[in-house]
Amino acid sequence: MSRQQQDRGEVSAQVVLVTPVIILLLVIAIQAGLYFHTSSIAGAAAAEGAAAASVVRASREVTAWRGQQAAQNLVIEAGGRTTSAAVVAVNTATVAITVVVRVPRIIPFFPSSVRRTVIEPRERFTTELAR
């Protein structure tokens, strides 16, 4: 028997063994991309909400509402889905906003949501003499 006849069918066996591994790696790469994209959306939404809430000179409820609305609008515009309303903590010096965005899942062992928190100082208006 010649060498070519002995090696027949070896390539198809290799393809059958390697193809699932390549597909699994491709799916993991896609899931990782979705996770990092969602993480970017959550961070941007938290920053936008904190920035919107930090410039409001109103009651804490109005400040929190403005921050929530700004964060929610950015998540919707970017195509993400929040798991709950943004949580805004307002005190006299800072505004902290936490946004949780759901990650689209292809495979089960990746996290199902991303949480990002941004703390921003509140704007303070001072007189010229107080500077």
List where the protein language model places each region.
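Low-complexity, S/T/G/P-rich flexible repeat/linker segments used as non-globular hinges
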Residues: R105-R131
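Alpha-helical assembly-interface signal, strongest on the long, hydrophobic N-terminal helix that forms
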Residues: M1-Q68
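Short amphipathic secondary-structure patches
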Residues: E48-R102, L129
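Extracytoplasmic/periplasmic mature domains of Sec-exported, cell-envelope-associated bacterial proteins
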Residues: A29, S59-R60, R81, P104, ...
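Residues in flexible loops and secondary-structure boundaries
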Residues: L25, A44, E61, V95, ...
